[in-house]
Each structure stands twice: as C-alpha cells, then as structure tokens.
C-alpha cells in the first residue's frame, strides 16, 4: 500500500531549486506516514531552518526523511548529508565510545577513574568510579574561571578537571553540561592514547559504516556538510542580556553555571568556533540517519546489518538497574542519568534512553521494543523554542504507534540511499 504524504522520493543526495527546501525528501514505510507529516510540519518556511528524521525498527531503517534549509539565508536546501551541531545529544555519542571501550575490557564501570587516569585522583577524587562520573555525580559541573579560550582547548580542560576540587554536589546527580565530555575524553585518552575526535571515527562511524558522526567540524573531503545554526543574530550584541546571563550563571543557577562561559552565545554564531574545538559534551555534528543507526544498533541488541557493534550483555546492562528518577540538582527537574544516557521523567510516554540536546535535536533508543530514532535540526532560540524541546515527545509517540502497526501488518525497510525509491517494496511515506 502506497501512502502519499508529499515526500519527494527521488534518490538524490542534494537538491537544487529555490523551492527544494519546502518539500520533504527521502523515504518511509507507509505505516509511518503520520510520523512524516508531523516532522514536515516543523519546518514551515525558510526562517525556521531544516532538519532530518530517521527511524529504525528491529535494526532496519523504516524512515529516512529531510526537509528545509541548511543555511541562515534560506538558499541551501537540506540534504541527506546535512548535519547540524547537536549540542548535548553529543553526550550520547561520547558515552557510546566509552561503552565500546568497556566492551573490550579496557574500562570497568566500577573501577576508580584514577586507576586509568592517575592525575584525576587529586583533591579527593581517588575513589570516584567511572559509573559515578557517567551518572553526573562527580561534583565537577561548574565552569567558574574557565575562559572561552580554555574551553576551546580540550587538553587544558581535561587537565583542569583532573586537578579540580569537587564541589558540594559530589555524589549527587548534578548535570555536567560541558565538563562531562572532557571527563570522558580524559578517561578515553588515558586508556587509548587517542583524543575523542579520532575515537568518534574509529569507534562509531567506521564500525557503523557511516560518515555522519563527527566531533566538531567534519574534514573538508567528508560528504557530511555542517548546517548553519539558525538563531537571532543580534543576541550576542545585547549587552544587557549578556550581563544578565553572566550574573545568573555565577550567582543563582548551578545548571546555568555548568554551561555558561563568556562569549557562549557568540561562539555558536557565524562560523561557529566551537566546531573547531573538541567538546565531547556539546559539539558533535550528526546526520539523522547516522545517529539513528547508532541507536538502532543498541535497540537491536547491539547488532546492525550483521555488525556486532556492542555485545548483547553490555546492552542488557544499559537497560537494567536504571536508578530511581530524582530531581537533578542543577537542572531542577527529575532525570534518570545512567551510564551517560538519560531517561525522561514522563512515565511511559517516552520509554527508553538516549540524549536530547539544546534546541531539541535528539537520539533515542528502546531496546525493549526495538525502536530507535534520531531527529536533528539547526534551529536554536527561535519563536518555536518550546515546541522544539517538546516536539520530539509527540513524534516519538507517533513512532511507537506506527511501529506497533508495522509489526502487526508487516513493514518494508527503506531502500538504501542511492537506489531509486520507487522500486517495488520501497514505499515513500
């Protein structure tokens, strides 16, 4: 059964023409037609940017669609290879690197971090375990005193954290908005001798046979193309707002203090200097199909397309022993942090785990149902900011409904990119 949702299912990797961004491109199993329509409604015009959505069911891609524009001017249509900076959704990728290392016996979650990274044992941190740090319980969330230049140097930040004295929230769940990444990269460097940017390639992109997962700016010869962030360009020049944010960060909010630094807003504008750094908690660049493929492997017991990405035992450990949902001391909302991912404090509306980023880009997996998805876009601080941070919940609800119907009545994986989507069995959603 073919379902027409307005998806242009020509197999092209980029799209020319002034109106290309107004159409949905890609493919989807017809059971997911309502999912595609909900996604398409997110990008009504040029000033709202663009994005992509990919869904996996039992290790098979069943949705792979994109729409909108990849630049602020609204001249460059989104393509299959467009990839925005996904902010904190990067943490899920970084955590997965650590799990790959643990799977090979290089890291034990119950071992002290200092066992691998001796410098980290300074100032009362000798007994902090890998699990503690991955649960955001290290007491090292604050950025007080760190300059923008410091944050653009990952080695400096790793050294600062290794020497730091834990704060009063040691042992309590307190979201490490930026420092989580350098804690993970320092640990990974200690056991591999490699930086996290290289490990993204070796531990994620290469075994998954995809180019669309990068830490920072992709190489010039990579097919992945960075989508520009769409946000009000006059915010950085607003002296009153900048002063207010600085005061808020240093006096009132631990959560804000964990992510604010001088020049934070300007850093993601223009050519985005953050892309040239290694910030493993925030500056990942990902296509939806690549991020969904990573989470699709986890949802499928650690395997995808015959590739053993993670052991079944490790995936089982990710789904078991998830702690009671308690209020996070920095975010002031209940979240379930477990080994680098988080759950959602909304009952059974969004089962599973993954990581959402600032603006609403997200990667998510539910091994109990075999469903995984990724939604990425380049919109930040737009008039739709509240919708962006809640919209993925509604889309995931539609995905779960469609997946249940697809299991009952059968489904057809989308055709691998590059082949005509109009061939038999490759239905456009």
Swiss-Prot record:
Pfam families in alphabetical order: Beta-lactamase (PF00144)
Reported regulation of activity: Esterase and beta-lactamase activities are inhibited by the active site residue modifiers phenylmethanesulfonylflouride (PMSF) and diethylpyrocarbonate (DEPC).
Main EC class the enzyme belongs to: hydrolase
Active site: 88 (acyl-ester intermediate)
GO molecular function, one term: triacylglycerol lipase activity
Location(s) in or outside the cell: Secreted, Cell wall; Cell membrane
Keyword Cell membrane: yes
An annotated GO cellular component: extracellular region
GO biological process, one term: glycerolipid catabolic process
SUPFAM superfamilies: beta-lactamase/transpeptidase-like (SSF56601)
Superkingdom of the organism of origin: Bacteria
Result, substituting residue 51 to A: 60% loss of esterase activity
SS bond list: none
Induction line: Up-regulated in acidic and oxidative stress conditions.
Temperature dependence: Optimum temperature is 40 degrees Celsius (with pNP-butyrate as substrate).
Region forming the signal peptide: none
Reported pH dependence: Optimum pH is 7.0 (with pNP-butyrate as substrate).
Catalytic activity from the UniProt record: a fatty acid ester + H2O = an aliphatic alcohol + a fatty acid + H(+); an acetyl ester + H2O = an aliphatic alcohol + acetate + H(+); a butanoate ester + H2O = an aliphatic alcohol + butanoate + H(+); an octanoate ester + H2O = an aliphatic alcohol + octanoate + H(+)
Keyword Transferase: no
Keywords: Cell membrane, Cell wall, Hydrolase, Membrane, Secreted
Classification via InterPro entries: Beta-lactam-related, Beta-lactam/transpept-like, Beta-lactamase/esterase
EC number from the UniProt entry: 3.1.1.-, 3.5.2.6
Protein family (similarity comment): Belongs to the beta-lactamase family.
Function, as annotated: Shows both esterase and beta-lactamase activities, with a much higher activity against phenyl esters than against beta-lactams. Shows esterase activity against both long-chain and short-chain p-nitrophenol (pNP) esters, with a preference for shorter chain esters. Hydrolyzes substrates containing beta-lactam ring such as nitrocefin and ampicillin. Functions as an immunogen that activates both humoral and cell-mediated responses.
Protein name as annotated: Esterase/beta-lactamase LipL
The organism of origin for this protein: Mycobacterium tuberculosis (strain ATCC 25618 / H37Rv)
């Amino acid at each position: 059964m073919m379902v027409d949702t307005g998806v242009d299912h020509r197999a092209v990797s980029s799209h020319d023409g002034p109106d290309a961004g107004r159409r949905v491109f890609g493919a989807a199993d017809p059971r997911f037609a309502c999912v595609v329509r909900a996604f398409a409604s997110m990008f009504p015009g040029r000033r709202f940017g663009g994005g992509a959505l990919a869904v996996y069911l039992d290790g098979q891609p069943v949705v792979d669609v994109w729409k909108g524009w990849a630049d602020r001017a609204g001249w460059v249509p989104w393509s299959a290879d467009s990839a925005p900076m996904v902010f904190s959704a990067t943490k899920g990728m970084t955590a997965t690197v650590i799990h790959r290392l643990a799977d090979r016996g290089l890291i034990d979650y119950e071992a002290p971090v200092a066992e691998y990274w001796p410098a980290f044992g300074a100032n009362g941190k000798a007994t902090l375990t890998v699990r503690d740090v991955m649960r955001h319980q290290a007491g090292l969330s604050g950025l007080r005193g760190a300059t923008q230049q410091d944050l653009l140097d990952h080695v400096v930040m790793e050294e600062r954290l290794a020497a730091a004295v834990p704060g009063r929230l040691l042992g309590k769940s307190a979201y490490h908005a930026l420092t989580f990444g350098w804690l993970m990269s320092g640990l990974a460097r200690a056991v591999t001798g490699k930086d996290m940017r290289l490990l993204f390639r070796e531990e994620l992109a290469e075994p998954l046979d995809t180019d669309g997962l990068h830490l920072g700016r992709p190489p010039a010869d990579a097919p992945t193309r960075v989508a520009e962030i769409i946000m009000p360009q006059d915010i950085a020049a607003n002296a009153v707002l900048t002063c207010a944010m600085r005061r808020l960060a240093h006096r009132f909010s631990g959560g804000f203090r964990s992510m604010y630094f001088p020049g934070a807003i300007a850093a993601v504008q223009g050519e985005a200097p953050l892309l040239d750094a290694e910030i493993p908690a925030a500056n990942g660049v990902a296509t939806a199909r690549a991020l969904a493929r990573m989470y699709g492997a986890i949802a499928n017991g650690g395997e995808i397309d015959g590739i053993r990405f993670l052991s079944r035992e490790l995936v089982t450990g990710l789904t078991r022993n998830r702690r009671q949902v308690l209020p996070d001391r920095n975010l002031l909302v209940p979240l379930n942090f477990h080994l680098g991912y988080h759950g959602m404090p909304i009952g059974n509306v969004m089962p599973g785990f993954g990581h959402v980023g600032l603006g609403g880009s997200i990667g998510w997996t539910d091994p109990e149902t075999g469903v995984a998805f990724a939604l990425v876009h380049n919109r930040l601080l737009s008039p739709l900011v509240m919708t962006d941070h809640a919209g993925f919940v509604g889309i995931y609800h539609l995905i779960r409904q469609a997946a249940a119907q697809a299991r009952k009545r059968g489904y057809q994986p989308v055709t691998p990119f590059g082949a005509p989507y109009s061939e038999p069995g490759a239905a456009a959603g």
